[in-house]
């Protein structure tokens, strides 16, 4: 059987990435050019700065990915690209590069939903068993997704306000931590205790929705009031208390989802899936079903996950034409206007 190679492009936020996937789940390369240092001084991602950085490095990422994989453009079977959700300017840079490369090399173009990429990153670790439930936790999204079969995604619960990763970064900024703050909060939390007892919004309610704005506000108010009064705050305990509230909410809603849907596997993915506290709680509390979490290198934004999701669409011959455009608010069940089924 002839090997299949998919080149994938990811540029939805502040990581420029190009990867090569061989067949179903073998990543030959996954080049990532991070912009974290450029955005640290702003305490978050500046869209215009992100777009300019993508333009500067994307050609080099293409070259490095092919070289690292040991193949040439003539060996490729298709080109995949993230077309949403994300920052519109950033998405357009990756789309333009992917479309130009596909057109120049007479290759089909596969449109990929960024969040489907996060979910399917788990395929690199082991074959997924369907139906499954996915908990997707990142800087821009917090979602529970039911996946009855490959490529069929149904959102069954999501945040009503802040995403969990966004909440981490905002409270991290209040504490003076470096952006992105999630890793540092996680590390500090392991040294502290849940002494501040922050609220767990909607944790006992029957639905599968999330809310983190109240938790974030409670944290910020406590911090500001203590500073105004000159009260001492223990940083490790602050982090432990915040993280305990977050994890209680995530675990409670995930358990409810697993009790309501006939899932054979739980996938936990997205940037926050790198959180060691979350991984520990999942291992301790969800033992009746297999839990799959991508390796750390595939938790953040990367083109490898886009390639892994694209492999499923390739099998279905789901390609787009060259009118494919960026969809910054793309939903899981939304397909591009240029969707072509061959």
UniProtKB/Swiss-Prot annotation:
State where substrate binds: 136-140, 169, 182, 186, 275
The cofactors required by this protein are: Fe(2+)
The subcellular location is: Cytoplasm
Molecular function GO labels: iron ion binding; N(6)-L-threonylcarbamoyladenine synthase activity
Q: SUPFAM superfamilies from the xrefs? A: Actin-like ATPase domain (SSF53067)
Q: Which InterPro entries did the record assign?
A: ATPase_NBD (IPR043129), Gcp-like_dom (IPR000905), KAE1/TsaD (IPR017861), TsaD (IPR022450)
Assigned GO CC terms? cytoplasm
Extract the coiled-coil ranges from the record. Answer: none
Note accompanying the cofactor annotation: Binds 1 Fe(2+) ion per subunit.
Going by the UniProt record, its keywords in alphabetical order are: Acyltransferase, Cytoplasm, Iron, Metal-binding, Transferase, tRNA processing
Recorded catalytic reaction(s): these are: L-threonylcarbamoyladenylate + adenosine(37) in tRNA = N(6)-L-threonylcarbamoyladenosine(37) in tRNA + AMP + H(+)
Record-linked Pfam families: TsaD (PF00814)
- Alphabetically, which GO biological process terms does the record hold? tRNA threonylcarbamoyladenosine modification
Q: Which family does it belong to?
A: Belongs to the KAE1 / TsaD family.
What does this protein's UniProt record list under function? Required for the formation of a threonylcarbamoyl group on adenosine at position 37 (t(6)A37) in tRNAs that read codons beginning with adenine. Is involved in the transfer of the threonylcarbamoyl moiety of threonylcarbamoyl-AMP (TC-AMP) to the N6 group of A37, together with TsaE and TsaB. TsaD likely plays a direct catalytic role in this reaction.
Query: What HAMAP family does the entry give?
Result: TsaD
Q: What is this protein called?
A: tRNA N6-adenosine threonylcarbamoyltransferase
In its UniProt entry, the species of origin is given as: Streptococcus pyogenes serotype M1
Write the lineage as a comma-separated list. Bacteria, Bacillati, Bacillota, Bacilli, Lactobacillales
- Gene designation per UniProt: tsaD
């Amino acid at each position: 059987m002839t090997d299949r190679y998919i080149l994938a492009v990811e540029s939805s936020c502040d990581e420029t990435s190009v990867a090569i996937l061989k067949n179903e789940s073998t990543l030959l390369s996954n080049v990532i050019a991070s912009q974290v240092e450029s955005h640290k001084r702003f305490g978050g991602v500046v869209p215009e700065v992100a777009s300019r950085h993508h333009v500067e490095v994307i050609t080099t990422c293409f070259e490095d990915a092919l070289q690292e994989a040991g193949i040439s453009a003539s060996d490729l079977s298709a080109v995949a690209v993230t077309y949403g959700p994300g920052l519109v300017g950033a998405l357009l840079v990756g789309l333009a590069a992917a479309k130009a490369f596909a057109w120049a090399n007479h290759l089909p173009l596969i449109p990929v939903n960024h969040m489907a990429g996060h979910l399917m990153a788990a395929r690199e670790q082991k074959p997924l068993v369907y139906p499954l439930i996915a908990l997707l936790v990142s800087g821009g999204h917090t979602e529970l997704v039911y996946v009855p079969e490959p490529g069929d995604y149904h959102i069954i619960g999501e945040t009503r306000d802040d995403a969990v990763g966004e909440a981490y970064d905002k409270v991290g900024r209040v504490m003076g931590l470096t952006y992105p703050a999630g890793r540092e909060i996680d590390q500090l939390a392991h040294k502290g205790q849940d002494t501040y007892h922050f609220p767990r919004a909607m944790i006992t309610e029957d639905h599968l929705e999330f809310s983190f704005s109240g938790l974030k506000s409670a944290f910020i108010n406590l911090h500001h009031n203590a500073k105004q009064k000159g009260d001492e705050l223990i940083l490790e305990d602050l982090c432990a208390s915040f993280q305990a509230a977050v994890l209680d909410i995530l675990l409670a809603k995930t358990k409810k989802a697993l009790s309501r849907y006939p899932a054979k596997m739980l996938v936990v993915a997205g940037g926050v899936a790198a959180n060691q506290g979350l991984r520990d709680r999942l291992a301790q509390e969800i033992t009746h079903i297999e839990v799959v979490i991508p390796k750390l290198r595939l938790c953040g934004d990367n083109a490898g996950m886009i390639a892994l999701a694209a492999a499923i669409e390739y099998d279905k011959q789901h390609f787009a034409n060259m009118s494919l455009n960026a969809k910054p608010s793309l939903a899981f069940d939304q397909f591009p206007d240029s969707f072509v089924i061959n």
